Amino acid sequence: MDGLMWATRILCLLSLCGVTLGHLHLECDFITQLRDDELACLQAAEGTNNTSLGCPGTWDGLLCWPPTGSGQWVSLPCPEFFSHFGSDTGFVKRDCTITGWSNPFPPYPVACPVPLELLTKEKSYFSTVKIIYTTGHSISIVALCVAIAILVALRRLHCPRNYIHTQLFATFILKASAVFLKDAAIFQGDSTDHCSMSTVLCKVSVAISHLATMTNFSWLLAEAVYLSCLLASTSPRSKPAFWWLVLAGWGLPVLCTGTWVGCKLAFEDTECWDLDNSSPCWWIIKGPIVLSVGVNFGLFLNIICILLRKLEPAQGGLHTRAQYWRLSKSTLLLIPLFGIHYIIFNFLPDSAGLDIRVPLELGLGSFQGFIVAVLYCFLNQEVRTEISRKWYGHDPELLPARRTCTEWTTPPRSRLKVLTSEC
């Protein structure tokens, strides 16, 4: 069996099994490598003008055989792609005879085998991951929609901090929806057309996916910034600029994503814009994300330092310290929960740690929206109190239309005063 026939059979096997590696089908890696190798082989053949050699350079569909003199033989290793299936990749030998190149020996299926049982195992593994992240995103969308409805419907919960919560909820909904849109646009079936598609829908889905990811990180950062400003406020007039956070939280991701789209259109308008992990344009997206994760972690440490000072017995009564802790505990949980593993992975190559990265980012990451809704809404004491009042039939007209702000004053020697909402 020659290289072209074996390559075609491998593609059929990969497409049949639907194996996925990372965010791409495994057959896309195979097709990409074959195209690159074929192009390099043809370019090398064009630069060789020596017609005295017995066998000219040729591409057999899988390997590039260099020009060789009559009576000589060449041995080449199997393509690098086969290392996905094990470390024991063999060599293929061909002789240059008077009549031309001999058949490969040993045959490609023997020298470069593809174990079907391994493909079946990988199919089962990634199918399970897909079921998990589809379920996780679906649960997250439902929980986040309910949480937004609660915070919007209960007027006593209207305050800047809860407004920021709703923005964060919206970014998780956008992120989950972008995953479904991208899957529908790129992986529509078992064919390999998605490996080379260049449709507008495909590119738009990738752009929306990047925008959703960036807005998600920006509003997680906004939560930390707002809490830091709130805890460090030294005057009733030093309120955080909420609308500046709104502008930055949505505007900067739109600006970065728009710049990335312009870069792709100008310099790399090929295929679906999804194969760009080594592209300079990719840092327009990845750079701000890495920066936001680093800043968020710094704010996390700063918030801890502020709380340690404010929770000292000399800095206020038991009620005041309880208010500070209740205000901060959700954000203190979320920042390390959603940031530490990104700090680790952002400084590793994109191909490193796939066995950990895939289930962590696609599987567990799909439940982040649900966790946010639980911490910021369903377990929030004020939210539960308001729902109880509505549920047990208290007349909402007898209650204030809006929650009043509470002024917390520390002992005179500290000369610190904090003006904030309890929610």
UniProtKB/Swiss-Prot annotation:
<dbReference type="GO" id="GO:0051649">
    <property type="term" value="P:establishment of localization in cell"/>
</dbReference>
<dbReference type="GO" id="GO:0030879">
    <property type="term" value="P:mammary gland development"/>
</dbReference>
<feature type="topological domain" description="Cytoplasmic">
    <location>
        <begin position="305"/>
        <end position="331"/>
    </location>
</feature>
<feature type="transmembrane region" description="Helical; Name=2">
    <location>
        <begin position="168"/>
        <end position="188"/>
    </location>
</feature>
<dbReference type="GO" id="GO:0046879">
    <property type="term" value="P:hormone secretion"/>
</dbReference>
<keyword id="KW-1015">Disulfide bond</keyword>
<dbReference type="GO" id="GO:0016520">
    <property type="term" value="F:growth hormone-releasing hormone receptor activity"/>
</dbReference>
<feature type="transmembrane region" description="Helical; Name=4">
    <location>
        <begin position="241"/>
        <end position="261"/>
    </location>
</feature>
<dbReference type="GO" id="GO:0005886">
    <property type="term" value="C:plasma membrane"/>
</dbReference>
<dbReference type="GO" id="GO:0040018">
    <property type="term" value="P:positive regulation of multicellular organism growth"/>
</dbReference>
<keyword id="KW-1133">Transmembrane helix</keyword>
<dbReference type="GO" id="GO:0060133">
    <property type="term" value="P:somatotropin secreting cell development"/>
</dbReference>
<dbReference type="InterPro" id="IPR036445">
    <property type="entry name" value="GPCR_2_extracell_dom_sf"/>
</dbReference>
<dbReference type="GO" id="GO:0019838">
    <property type="term" value="F:growth factor binding"/>
</dbReference>
<dbReference type="InterPro" id="IPR017981">
    <property type="entry name" value="GPCR_2-like_7TM"/>
</dbReference>
<keyword id="KW-0472">Membrane</keyword>
<dbReference type="GO" id="GO:0017046">
    <property type="term" value="F:peptide hormone binding"/>
</dbReference>
<keyword id="KW-0812">Transmembrane</keyword>
<dbReference type="GO" id="GO:0043567">
    <property type="term" value="P:regulation of insulin-like growth factor receptor signaling pathway"/>
</dbReference>
<feature type="transmembrane region" description="Helical; Name=1">
    <location>
        <begin position="131"/>
        <end position="151"/>
    </location>
</feature>
<dbReference type="InterPro" id="IPR017983">
    <property type="entry name" value="GPCR_2_secretin-like_CS"/>
</dbReference>
<dbReference type="GO" id="GO:0033143">
    <property type="term" value="P:regulation of intracellular steroid hormone receptor signaling pathway"/>
</dbReference>
<dbReference type="Pfam" id="PF00002">
    <property type="entry name" value="7tm_2"/>
</dbReference>
<dbReference type="GO" id="GO:0005640">
    <property type="term" value="C:nuclear outer membrane"/>
</dbReference>
<feature type="glycosylation site" description="N-linked (GlcNAc...) asparagine">
    <location>
        <position position="50"/>
    </location>
</feature>
<dbReference type="GO" id="GO:0008340">
    <property type="term" value="P:determination of adult lifespan"/>
</dbReference>
<feature type="topological domain" description="Cytoplasmic">
    <location>
        <begin position="232"/>
        <end position="240"/>
    </location>
</feature>
<dbReference type="GO" id="GO:0009986">
    <property type="term" value="C:cell surface"/>
</dbReference>
<feature type="topological domain" description="Extracellular">
    <location>
        <begin position="262"/>
        <end position="283"/>
    </location>
</feature>
<dbReference type="GO" id="GO:0021984">
    <property type="term" value="P:adenohypophysis development"/>
</dbReference>
<feature type="disulfide bond">
    <location>
        <begin position="55"/>
        <end position="96"/>
    </location>
</feature>
<feature type="transmembrane region" description="Helical; Name=7">
    <location>
        <begin position="358"/>
        <end position="378"/>
    </location>
</feature>
<feature type="transmembrane region" description="Helical; Name=3">
    <location>
        <begin position="211"/>
        <end position="231"/>
    </location>
</feature>
<feature type="topological domain" description="Extracellular">
    <location>
        <begin position="23"/>
        <end position="130"/>
    </location>
</feature>
<feature type="topological domain" description="Cytoplasmic">
    <location>
        <begin position="152"/>
        <end position="167"/>
    </location>
</feature>
<comment type="function">
    <text>Receptor for GRF, coupled to G proteins which activate adenylyl cyclase. Stimulates somatotroph cell growth, growth hormone gene transcription and growth hormone secretion.</text>
</comment>
<dbReference type="GO" id="GO:0030252">
    <property type="term" value="P:growth hormone secretion"/>
</dbReference>
<dbReference type="GO" id="GO:0060124">
    <property type="term" value="P:positive regulation of growth hormone secretion"/>
</dbReference>
<dbReference type="GO" id="GO:0007189">
    <property type="term" value="P:adenylate cyclase-activating G protein-coupled receptor signaling pathway"/>
</dbReference>
<feature type="disulfide bond">
    <location>
        <begin position="41"/>
        <end position="64"/>
    </location>
</feature>
<dbReference type="InterPro" id="IPR003288">
    <property type="entry name" value="GPCR_2_GHRH_rcpt"/>
</dbReference>
<keyword id="KW-0675">Receptor</keyword>
